[in-house]
Regions:
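Canonical Rossmann dinucleotide-binding motif of NAD(H)/NADP(H)-dependent dehydrogenases/reductases
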Residues: 3-36, 192
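C-terminal substrate-recognition "lid" of short-chain dehydrogenase/reductases
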Residues: 128, 143, 231-266
Length: 267
């Protein structure tokens, strides 16, 4: 349908080499957009762009560095003459290097300040900077759609019982920083939607539910049991939502949070 057609438009996707970033790039390209796959690792984002063929290119950038982002925006405008869509997808989620210490290290009382600061830098400051540098170009042009990737954990608190083993022992805790940063992204989305509404730039959030990605069978079953649709998301389940938010199909939608979670937050 023409409402969903992104032909002639240029989209930048940050965190393009990640599990969902790859899918966002593919979905936008299939809808007709020229996609700029952006990640901190040049080789991995090059592989993503290669899969897009003539519909994409890779440009490495650091979302926490405004100089790097200015270079990215200038390069894209020199190449295509426009920026129509920005998908703020880059984020980090805690991984503990020592599984044996994960239980104690992930407790709120013990959570390392360094990990807190690093996640804030990428997950919140990165979204702020990308929007400030790249989104400002869109506002000056009087058009565009910004999609901030948040999470169900920005809406509801983690159920820590999900992270127990089959015997009921806590394996680790979902740490405080990921829900905190995703909640901040949702608040920032509303701010920016109101701020740039008159400039023709729409700003919405996409909040995915849990994505199946090699978790053990017990976790998958427990998560699925808490979801009305009875399963975790597949990485491809968010393609339609990204195209919808990027396209004219959502032309009267801004400041909203599109939950794609199989009903996880409904119960």
């Amino acid at each position: 349908m023409s409402l969903f057609d992104l032909g002639g438009k240029t989209a930048i996707v940050t965190g393009a080499a990640g599990l969902l970033g790859r899918q966002h790039c593919q979905a936008l390209a299939e809808a007709g957009a020229f996609v700029v796959a952006t990640d901190s690792d040049r080789d991995t984002c090059a592989a993503v762009a290669e899969a897009l063929g003539k519909s994409g290119i890779a440009i490495a950038a650091d979302v926490t560095d405004p100089v790097s982002l200015r270079q990215l925006a200038d390069a894209v405008r020199s190449l295509t003459g426009r920026i129509d869509v920005l998908v703020n997808n880059a984020a980090i989620n805690d991984k503990f290097e020592n599984p044996a210490a994960a239980l104690e290290d992930s407790r709120f009382e013990n959570y390392p300040l360094e990990m807190w600061k690093r996640s804030l830098e990428v997950n919140v400051t990165g979204v702020f900077l990308c929007s400030q540098v790249i989104g400002a170009d869109m506002a000056r042009a009087g058009r565009g759609s910004i999609i901030n990737v948040a999470s169900t954990y920005g809406v509801v608190a983690p159920d820590q019982s999900l992270y127990r083993d089959p015997e009921g022992r806590q394996r680790f805790y979902k740490t405080p920083v990921y829900p905190t940063t995703k909640g901040a992204v949702l608040a920032f989305t509303r701010f920016l939607a109101a701020y740039w509404g008159g400039a023709g730039v729409r700003v919405n959030a996409l909040s995915p539910g849990g994505v199946e990605n090699g978790q053990d069978d017990f976790f998958v079953a427990e998560y699925s049991r808490r979801t009305p649709l009875g399963r975790m998301a597949a990485p491809t389940d968010f393609r339609g939502a990204v195209v919808y938010l990027a396209s004219d199909a959502s032309g009267y939608m801004t400041g909203a949070n599109l939950l794609v979670d199989g009903g996880f937050t409904a119960i």
